[in-house]
Regions:
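N-terminal secretory signal peptides that target proteins for export/translocation
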Residues: 1-4
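Extracytoplasmic/periplasmic ligand-capture domains
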Residues: 23, 63-65, 91-121, 129-130, ...
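Long beta-strand-rich cores associated with HINT superfamily self-processing modules
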Residues: 345, 487-511
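Short, well-ordered beta-strand segments
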Residues: 28-32, 236, 358-360, 481
């Protein structure tokens, strides 16, 4: 009896330290430039919201740190079982934060919801129906062959939702009450102040190593860096290049960089849309004329902006596709500044004496976005395009301009898509009727529709190369550069920046 008790005591002494070590501990603070517009991740198309959502929700598949697609809530990668049918086997034993089981009904509910008129719905348009085969198998029927199905399922907007908890609930309710299967649960969201998350002890992969994660919006670059230096935050995004050396030489913080999937561009309004994303007709402003758009493109010296504003921490692009994207064409070269050609195009468009223009830009969202917009404004003014710059806090920029099709005539935006495919660059921004579109070109739409259904990669790549050339000729946007993502982080963290801009506390640990 004594021996048995002694053995039990030894076992207890051995087990307790292991459990204590494994339990989530500590707190970190992550400073983003802006607060999310919503925590209903199916109803957003912005990275700050996706970063927070990646802690609360899981998707069927995801990209690992090397951007390779791997199973997540799916037990294995989806299989094409017919030309327009994808089968997905699901992981068992997973629960939502409220205790609801994750199963085939969850997938059916989530995919049907995300394609039904939400901000990201254009990415899920090919889904025709979702069939529940058994509790842990679904078959997704598509209206046409869909080669990017698996990569779209890694989209943060394809997050899985609990059908019982969310039945009949609107997006405002879900934004206030996010319930996922993710590694963290929401504790509170004090709008424009902080989002507090706590580790989910029942997470299917095992509990996170860090107990509490706080997101704080700090729009000002210098304030964000100062907070990092002072130890008020542990990770800071969008480090301005001119402050990178300070971080690199600081004894308690370090710089982590990654080539970004994001490009920055000037977008043009060429057509008008109503609030339901229906085409109204040609835009009545100056940017409806292709020659004006081309003149603006030739008036800008992007190389000088990259050198002078971004300290060389960016890469010129010929389109909105980076070398990381399927559809990228290395043979295409960026437009060089040509003031004579810009003036020639303006004269041909009926503006021999120049013209007046408004440029809208966010402030605090992208690396030195306001300064980039100011540099563009100065260059356009020198070229005879009298430009007035208006800057906005990012949430207002999206809600009051971009999401209601009133962003123009010219507006600065960044775009990064984790699918790494031209489909989710060109589709959401330029396809007729897309949620963010202010452009219409039936030839472009037809080629994009064709590319979206080609299962042969060579044919699909060739089609995107043709689309790239059409896009450059019609100039619905001026591609500026591929961003190089710069992060500052505390040396008490084990962490490395990713190229898809996600910051995952689950992958972090405290030293």
């Amino acid at each position: 009896m004594v021996l048995r008790r002694l053995c039990s005591l030894v076992v207890a002494l051995l087990v307790v330290p292991a459990l204590g070590w494994a339990a989530p501990q500590g707190k970190i603070v992550i400073a983003q430039g802006v607060d999310p517009t919503t925590l209903d991740t199916q109803n957003q198309q912005e990275t700050p919201a996706s970063v927070v959502a990646s802690h609360l929700f899981d998707t069927l598949v995801e990209r690992d740190a090397n951007l390779k697609i791997v199973p997540a809530l799916a037990a294995e990668l989806p299989k094409l079982v017919a030309p327009t049918t994808w089968e997905v086997k699901l992981r068992r034993g997973v629960k939502f934060h409220n205790g609801e089981d994750f199963n085939a009904e969850s997938v059916k509910f989530s995919l049907e919801r995300v394609k039904a008129g939400l901000r990201a719905s254009s990415n899920f348009r090919p889904i025709e129906k979702v069939d529940v085969v058994d509790p842990y198998t679904v078959r997704v029927q598509t209206s046409k062959p869909w080669p990017t199905f698996t990569s779209i399922m890694a989209f943060r907007q394809a997050s899985m939702y609990p059908p019982k908890a969310y039945a009949g609930k609107d997006t405002a309710f879900i934004s206030r009450n996010p319930i996922g299967t993710g590694p963290y649960k929401l504790v509170r969201w004090s709008k424009d102040e902080e989002i507090v998350l706590e580790a989910n002890d029942q997470y299917w992969r095992g509990a996170a190593r860090i107990k509490t994660v706080v997101f704080r919006p700090i729009p000002d670059d210098a304030v964000r860096v100062a907070a990092l230096q002072n130890g008020e935050v542990d990770v800071a995004v969008n480090i301005p290049p001119h402050l990178a050396k300070i971080i690199a030489n600081h004894p308690k913080i370090f710089l982590s960089t990654a080539p970004s999937i994001r490009t920055l561009q000037l977008m043009f309004v060429t057509h008008e849309y109503d609030a339901q994303h229906k085409l109204v007709g040609p835009y009545k402003g100056v940017t409806a004329d292709k020659r004006v758009r081309q003149a603006i493109a030739h008036a800008i010296d992007v190389d000088e902006i990259v050198k002078g504003v971004l300290d060389g921490k960016a890469v010129r692009t010929a389109t909105m596709l980076t070398p990381l994207h399927f559809g990228y064409d290395a043979s295409l070269k960026p437009i060089k500044q040509d003031l004579a050609k810009a003036k020639q195009l303006l004269t041909a468009a009926g503006f021999p004496g120049g013209m007046d223009l408004v440029l809208n830009s966010p402030q605090g969202r992208y690396v030195r976005d306001k300064e980039v917009a100011e540099a563009v404004t100065g260059q356009l003014n020198k070229a005879g395009i009298r430009t007035q710059l208006k800057t906005y806090e990012f949430v207002n920029y999206l809600n009051n301009l971009v999401y209601v099709h009133k962003p123009g005539p010219v507006w600065l935006i960044g775009w990064g898509t984790p699918t790494l495919d031209a489909e989710t660059v060109y589709g959401p921004l330029f396809r007729t009727g897309s949620n963010l579109g202010n452009y219409h070109n039936s030839d472009f739409d037809g080629m994009l529709d064709q590319a979206q259904t080609l299962m042969d990669e060579k044919q699909r790549l060739a089609t995107y190369h043709r689309i790239n050339k059409l896009w450059i000729d019609d100039m619905p946007a001026v591609p500026l550069y591929q961003q190089v993502d710069l992060y500052g982080a505390s040396k008490r963290l084990n962490w490395k920046a990713r190229s898809d801009e996600l910051i995952k506390a689950y992958d972090m640990s405290l030293k």
